[in-house]
């Protein structure tokens, strides 16, 4: 990575404390002064974030966990919060949930200079600096999400090492190895414990979800219908609920709504380990593991929304077949139509002519590629929804 002029300036002026953070002190989460001299010799993470942005709220716990682990191991690492909050109460509320110091909220000039110097255009952003002020990683958010404290010291060599380890891990993956990460060798059935070994050779969906989650509730109903259809066809398919519930009551309520197996509840330790293993960032998420124990897809939710039970067994070959069928079916649709839900004429598009991922404005379900679209307004519907509506209007 090239050494920017400001990093050279940092070295000439005493490293991180001398130039990159040109202020007398920082403040702790409790409001006490923190001396810049305490940063000397440490790798620094400048954390640009704001209380109002959900992605920052989601990332802060991950960074906090990595921070505590590194502190316990005596790593020379410090994080500095650079707030993008709009008012002091929001800043103070967010900072109190962090274990590291921050640039004082009122030091607007410093925050502006840091944002401009590191070209911060979006949050969350974690700029990692070496003790001499050189940029090690322009944005380590993804690394912390994927690897936690193992990403330290965030160098290119360390990232390459982690990626190689990950490739070896997935290459030798089996269903039993996956669940060894969680510390469990069984899951709960309706009446009994089911050994993981009994599921080897099946296509298994790992369903990360929670009870108090509106998107999860909606998707669970759809997934349950598809699960029932596949079971009726005697397909070798099983789903395991991986609870992301914060309380056992929510877990039990979720289990009562689901016809499949469930990972035992243990305050989130087992589920968290599996979520980290598969880099799960949001729920609901459906990870599909094939009969050989290898990951087929982490996009099971999208595939179910797009293709319903026809997505099974979720392989690339099956999805290509479905896409070819869609291409053929599209030939039977008119090139344009008038839809009662929109004032403009809609034109047919594909992923090769302006189409892409979308949410159907008629049925609120996901779509991909083929659609009826209003280019002026961005209004899009499934081809089938356009045909159905036109049929009802006649």
UniProtKB/Swiss-Prot annotation:
GO terms for molecular function: protein-disulfide reductase [NAD(P)H] activity. Residues 15-176, 180-327 form the Thioredoxin domain. It catalyses: [protein]-dithiol + NAD(+) = [protein]-disulfide + NADH + H(+); [protein]-dithiol + NADP(+) = [protein]-disulfide + NADPH + H(+). InterPro entries: C1-like_sf, DC1, Nucleoredoxin-like, Thioredoxin-like_fold, Thioredoxin-like_sf, Thioredoxin_domain. PROSITE patterns: THIOREDOXIN_2. Its EC number is 1.8.1.8. Keywords: NAD, Oxidoreductase, Repeat. Belongs to the nucleoredoxin family. Probable thiol-disulfide oxidoreductase that may participate in various redox reactions. This is Probable nucleoredoxin 2. It comes from Oryza sativa subsp. japonica.
